[in-house]
Amino acid sequence: MLCASAAWPPLVRAWGDEGHQIVALIAQHYLDARVELRVQALLASDRSALVSGSSMASEATWADRYRDADRDADRRHYEQTRQWHYVDIELSSPNLARACFAHPALPPATPASAGPAEDCVVDKIDQFEAELRNARTSPDERRLALQFLLHLVGDVHQPLHASDDRDHGGNRKRVSAPGMHAGNLHHYWDTEFVRLLGEDAQSVSQRLLGRISASDIEAWQRGSPADWARESFWLAKAVSYGALPPADGGGRYRLSVGYVRDAISAVQLQLSRAGVRLAAVLNRDLRQ
């Protein structure tokens, strides 16, 4: 069973574009007015042309675009940043420190955006937060910190970005479900279950906002990125992986209507938590 209140109904890109946009729109709703102006000012300096416009919802997809922009060329950005989007906590022997490469420190005078490739989403959120709240961080690096945070806070809430069953976070598990195209388990959690919420990120975010209570906000704002990763891991262990049926003779997992229903409930919960927590991060780091 999911730990949610009764108000809640039952190529790696965590959440896909729509999911990240939903998280950003929820977060924007909870921003202090002065903080929202500072966010807008930082994002307005983005000259990368990797996303359309400079809204929070658009920029929440920037980190994926940045990672993939040179994927078919020299792969510099791809190889440097791809592991920053997840933390592969092993399902059978969970160890966050091991999944985070023993938490390597940034080399002296190295900005977080140029940090080691072997690092995890938990550490990168902490590093980019430290830069964002430091007014002495260079303007360009501060904008990069914001762009990464808009995305990575969403990533750590996708259960299959915080767990691994020796299957690349579900990418090697073939699945199908009634009325849905066959695919892999990771893609279902990234994209397909989000699509079942509705095609329009704006309307989905408004619907989820209507279900978030004051007690939800108070509870969800507690904890650290490491806590969020562990929370996502246990959700993956209970639902994403834990509720899978046995594979059929061809190695495919045929998901039941009940599995899809529980997955949708989990996705709604995680998108909402991510939005509330992203707002808390930005309000804390940009309030000064």
State where each predicted segment sits.
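N-terminal, motif-rich segments that launch catalysis or mediate targeting to/interaction with membranes
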Residues: 13-152, 159-288
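N-terminal signal peptide c-region/cleavage motif recognized by signal peptidases
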Residues: 9-11
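Bacterial N-terminal signal peptides
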Residues: 1-7
